[in-house]
From Swiss-Prot:
An example Gene Ontology molecular-function term: RNA binding
The name this protein goes by in its record: tRNA pseudouridine synthase A
Sequence positions that bind substrate: Y111
BP GO annotations: tRNA pseudouridine synthesis
Key words of the record: Isomerase, tRNA processing
Positions annotated as active site in the UniProt record: D52 (nucleophile)
Quaternary structure annotation from Swiss-Prot or TrEMBL: Homodimer.
Catalysed reactions, as listed in the record: uridine(38/39/40) in tRNA = pseudouridine(38/39/40) in tRNA
Source superkingdom: Bacteria
InterPro entries with a match to the protein in the record: PsdUridine_synth_cat_dom_sf, PsdUridine_synth_TruA, PsdUridine_synth_TruA_a/b_dom, PsdUridine_synth_TruA_C, TruA/RsuA/RluB/E/F_N
Top EC class, one word: isomerase
Zinc-finger in keyword set: no
Family: Belongs to the tRNA pseudouridine synthase TruA family.
């Protein structure tokens, strides 16, 4: 039975998240419906990670086993035909060894968080960025962000309902880059805790607003208490952009 690796993009706004829910629309649910419509039997689609409600992806990766061999480009096109009109697209399909696991074979996950830093309302990117009207000191945010690099107990930046066995994670990259009104937070790690990226971003925004210093951010990390976290950034600015294998 061939195993296929799928690279997927989606607008997370209409979904309860990646994970299948019986009564709510999910990205996994519409993908599994498209696979079933293509191959004729119910088929589980396994993602590299469970993005939350409202979180987007330009490079989510999934795998599925289909009891029929398709040319990868034909499978991609068939799935896209059945995905319409949902805001989900299969960008690429590949046949991979049956040892490939979208989640467990992943070596690194790359996220970007997009902020528009201006007083004017959003006209074109509603639901795709976080508008922060107060001027942000992006240089201070970047300097503070480096205090989170490395292996730490990230309990402060972990959702209280996170089911991970350990709060320890190793953060490989956390950069803050400004281009005009656009402030982008770029982060890479092998894996993250539930809501970790949005919690870090929200706390960095406090630094950018002058409410916290870099030392305050480091103290919040060291506190290892969820209550020490700053604001949690909203989901609409977050994108899963790439998964490395």
């Amino acid at each position: 039975m061939p195993r296929y690796k799928l690279t997927i993009e989606y607008d997370g706004a209409p979904f309860c998240g990646w994970q299948l829910q019986e009564t709510l629309p999910s990205v996994q649910g519409v993908l599994e419906a498209a696979v079933q419509a293509t191959c004729g039997v119910p088929t589980r689609v396994h993602g590299s990670g469970r993005t939350d409600a409202g979180v987007h992806a330009t490079g989510q990766v999934a795998h599925c086993d289909i009891d029929k061999e398709f040319r990868p480009d034909k499978l991609r096109d068939a799935l896209n035909a059945h995905l319409r009109p949902n805001p989900v697209a299969v960008l690429d399909a590949q046949i991979v060894p049956d040892t490939f696991e979208a989640r467990f074979s992943a070596r690194k996950r790359h996220y970007r968080y997009r902020i528009v830093n201006r007083r004017s309302n959003l006209a074109l990117e509603v639901g795709r960025v976080w508008r922060v009207p107060q001027r942000l000191d992006s240089d201070a945010m970047h300097v503070a962000a480096q205090r989170l690099i490395g292996k730490h107990d990230f309990t402060t930046f972990r959702d209280t309902e996170c089911q991970a066995k350990s709060p320890e994670k190793t953060l490989d990259q956390l950069d803050v880059v400004r281009d005009g009104d656009a402030v982008t937070i770029i982060t890479s790690a092998r894996s993250y805790l539930h809501s970790q990226v949005r919690s870090m971003v929200g706390s960095l925004v406090w630094v950018g607003q002058g409410r916290w210093s870099a030392d305050d951010l480091a103290a919040a990390l060291a506190a290892r208490r969820r209550a020490a976290c700053g604001v949690v950034a909203p989901p609409e600015g977050l994108y899963l952009v790439q998964v490395d294998y």
